[in-house]
Curated annotation (Swiss-Prot):
It comes from the Bacteria. GO terms for cellular component: plasma membrane; proton-transporting ATP synthase complex. It comes from Cereibacter sphaeroides (strain ATCC 17023 / DSM 158 / JCM 6121 / CCUG 31486 / LMG 2827 / NBRC 12203 / NCIMB 8253 / ATH 2.4.1.) (Rhodobacter sphaeroides). The lineage of its organism: Bacteria, Pseudomonadati, Pseudomonadota, Alphaproteobacteria, Rhodobacterales. This is ATP synthase epsilon chain 1. It is a peripheral membrane protein. It is found in: Cell inner membrane.
Amino acid sequence: MAGTLQFDIVSPERRLASFAATEVQVPGTDGDMTAMEGHAPTITTLRPGILRAHGPSGVQAYAVTGGFAEINATSISVLAEKAVAVEELTGTVLDEFIAEARELASVALPEDRDMAERTLNDMLALKASSGH
């Protein structure tokens, strides 16, 4: 498949996917971005959202709670704090993500509170957009 980059997504529990992708849409902390073959080397943090990888069997989508993505001209490696394939995503899973984010926001130090509240708001938006 011409014009591809190697896509890998892992969480602490397991490897979720590894395949050649034509593009990967990433929910970056500083804004969404699309990685394609030839991308400039970049490391970005992830915010809660949906990551979409366009591969040989169509679009594979994953809900991520945060993490990092390392992108270069030939590959993208995503190290997700938590990740679930969208087809496995349920209201219960989202509620667990939200409860954890809410707890972290409630105990965050003053200098970390803005980021914790932003993460909670991103989780709530993820649930609202998912239809669960």
